[in-house]
A protein has these predicted regions:
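Conserved catalytic-core motifs of GNAT/GCN5-like acyltransferases
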Residues: 108-110, 123, 128-145
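Short glycine/proline-centered loop/turn elements that form peptide/ligand docking sites
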Residues: 88, 92, 115-118, 135-140
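Acetyl-CoA-dependent GNAT
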Residues: 3, 10-81, 92-94, 98-102, ...
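Short coil/turn segments at alpha/beta junctions that flank glycine-rich nucleotide-binding fingerprints
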Residues: 85, 102-105
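Terminal substrate-recognition subdomain of acyl/acetyltransferases
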Residues: 1-2, 135, 140-157
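Conserved beta-strand edge residues that scaffold enzyme active sites
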Residues: 33, 37, 113, 136-137
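Active-site acidic-Proline motif in GNAT/NAT acetyltransferases
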Residues: 79-81, 85, 113-114
């Protein structure tokens, strides 16, 4: 779980510069500001805040799918100086709970095959690999597509 001094809450427009700074610190091919701006209204665009500073974020959306809505974790990052404290897990769990609350049944995400830390977190939360996508990332690295059934996640969490 997240440390007691951290609050996980919905993103606000005023948080976007901090979110972009974290994105740039964490990823070699960061999203631009306007990508985050377009996602402000997603049901699970959440930030982790400590002492007034945003230290991490998660973005997840929901898509109708014939009565079995599908969620998609689009982005999850924790500032390098705040890693190892459970913030990523807290953000992920909060996003999954929000998606479940809006009727999502299954959640998917893509992760770099080489990102062992993220893959371990996702496996701990019940995500299972369903396929590999060759050359998914701009640098040519493959992605693994992972999924979790939220009914199973809820009973196992």
């Amino acid at each position: 779980m997240t440390p007691l001094d951290v609050t996980i809450r919905r993103v606000e427009r005023a948080d976007l510069l901090s979110v972009v700074r974290i994105e740039r610190a964490c990823f070699s091919d960061p999203w631009p500001y306007d990508a985050f701006e377009r996602l402000l209204d997603e049901p699970a665009f959440l930030v982790a805040e400590r002492e007034g500073e945003v230290v991490g974020y998660v973005i997840a959306d929901a898509m109708p799918n014939h009565g079995r809505d599908i969620g998609h974790v689009k982005d999850l990052a924790v500032h390098p100086e705040a890693r190892g404290e459970g913030l990523g897990r807290g953000l992920l769990r909060s996003a999954l709970a929000r998606l479940r609350g809006v009727g999502v049944a299954v959640v998917r995400l893509e992760v770099r095959e080489s990102n062992a830390v993220a893959r371990s977190l996702y496996a701990d939360e019940g995500f299972e690999p369903v396929r590999r996508v060759s050359n998914y990332y701009r640098d040519g690295e493959d992605a693994l597509v992972l999924v979790v059934d939220l009914a199973e996640w809820t009973t196992g969490a």
